[in-house]
Amino acid sequence: MKFAPCLALQVAAAAVALTSAAFAAEGLKLVRLANPVGGHIHPAACVSAKGTLVVTYGHVNHRDLRLTRSTDGGATWSEPKPFAPTVGKTYYPGSLTTLRDGRLLHAWNRWSEPTNEKEPRSVLYSLSSDDGLTWSEPKPFPRDEKIVSNIRHPIVELTSNQWLLSLSDKTQVFDPTTGASQPFGDGRAHGLVPIVRTPKGSFISGTGLRSTDVGKTWQAIAPFPNLKEQGWRHEMVCLANGWLIASEILGPGVGGERIRYVLSRDDGVTWGEVFEYYNPGRAIGGRACPRTVELGGGNIGVVFYDVEPKQAGGPGLFFLKLSVDRLGREAKIRSSN
């Protein structure tokens, strides 16, 4: 069964570009791609083989999960539409991944029943073969019905039939052809943190661990960005050139005041540089939950939210495009602030 959301015209007027005065990195354009109502907005993002940007986010807390697309590198976005497999059902936001064969994988969290908001949650996934226009019938990942199991980060595609899942309750290798799963590496549960594989074959865990033997043994990384304390919120991404970037949000309160990348250029061994890309000069509204994708052409893009009601346009979900060259050139030595 296919779910086909209504197609919407991309209109530049819907994506409001703000001036660089709104954030720290001069010359960057902040694009508004949606106006979420509130709650767990927690976006997910991926880029298709054709270059289409696909973003999902919570428009209404646990009740209205929406999807928007961009075919011009994030300059304009389609009108956000409800994600068809969750219409009329409750959800908790998940992740997006582009598979090697070009399909998009969207994994999200369901509650104990289709329309309630009670634990234990578990994970469903759906696939798209047309850049996010239509989606397959949802299927579940293996679960223990008595244990909460959540996903918030992209999977790692080890092979076409081996997906590494970083779930809140376990770290598993899932076979989509059989529906079976098995523990990854030494069997430890890393928790709800990102895990990435580098071009050299190393695995970096958001718990601050690094493995060069496919997870059989792990070595501690210190210092390392504090991803594990709020693993659902933060991100870690490996770029095509081998650099790794992780999110860091500084400042008091729920949302902090500044968002920056922490950069590793040596396969995840050291994390000594930072690049700040968002600083509105006030408290950020909400957790931001940044999600970064590599766009091609030497660029990356990051999606995050700021629901401060007094900002121009009110609460918003935003997109920011940045060149990898600039990231590397302007990164500064990391300090505690």
Predicted regions and their residues:
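Asp-box/BNR beta-propeller blade signature and adjacent active/binding-site loops
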Residues: 25-337
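Sec/Tat signal peptide C-region and signal peptidase I cleavage site
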Residues: 20-24
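Bacterial N-terminal signal peptides that target proteins for export
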Residues: 1-12
